[in-house]
Amino acid sequence: IQDSDIVLLAVPTIAVEDTAKKVFEIVKNSIYVINVAKGFHPVTHDRLSVVIEKVADKEKCKGIISLIGPSHAEEVILRKLTCINAVSENEEAAKVIQHLFSNDYFRVYTNTDVIGAEIGVAIKNVMAIASGILEGSGQGDNARAALMTRGLAEMSRYGVSYGGKFETYLGLDGVGDLIVTCTSLHSRNFMAGFEIGKTQDVATFMKNNTKTVEGILACKVIHDEAQKRNISMPITDQVYAVLYEGKSPNQAISDLMKRDLKAEN
């Protein structure tokens, strides 16, 4: 990649920092860095564009762009119609990537709300685990619809508190990505939740899982940060209790349904 003008990072969240650092040590040219991982730094809790920015050689970085939106690679490779966002604070950089990737079956929009988009794409993975747990536990469409709707409320509440824009969560980076990740068998997060809900045995799943399930780490980061900021995240809290505190999935579902009654908004 030493002579590249554009470098795409397609690695797990925990590898983004080291990979980006090595990229800037190798490349000769000033480059656009594209990131497709979703989540937060496991220690600092930084968003991934911030992680990349901290290790970037400023003289070699033209822009950091995240590709975010409802997109499963299994469908893109088959040229199924897909729409996503090129997300960057540098709108011109986002437009470069927009035009590079757009074609007859893959349409790219731009979005400069990096905070909102990066937070949304991490939280939707947590909601996908929750959606899978519901499905694995034998719940139906009604429950999943409620989960996605209330999950969107958590997503926007958390993101706006950090400076994200509410309208971002009504677009591809919010409700769009939430729908596809919470309903698709292609989603590793959904399938992880499904297995946990079906077996009611999170310990065995965690021991045997060999796939990258970004929502597991994201859940811990979001839960911890929400606690510090006193942000109400009831679904996230229950997913955290299942993943990290040994709570049974069925008990978590029951506790959500037994919360104090209130107006929706």
Can you say where each PLM-predicted feature lies in the sequence?
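Rossmann-like NAD(P)(H) cofactor-binding subdomain of soluble oxidoreductases
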Residues: 2-79, 97
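Internal alpha-helical scaffold of NAD(P)-dependent oxidoreductase catalytic cores
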Residues: 15, 26, 51-63, 81-168
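NAD(P)-dependent Rossmann-like dehydrogenase/reductase catalytic/cofactor-binding core
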Residues: 124, 131-135, 160-170, 174-265
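Structural signal for hydrophobic packing residues in well-ordered secondary-structure cores
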Residues: 5-8, 27, 44, 56, ...
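Glycine-rich beta-alpha junction loops
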Residues: 38-40, 68-72, 88-90, 112-117, ...
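Generic structural signal for well-ordered, non-membrane alpha-helical segments
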Residues: 16, 41, 45, 49, ...
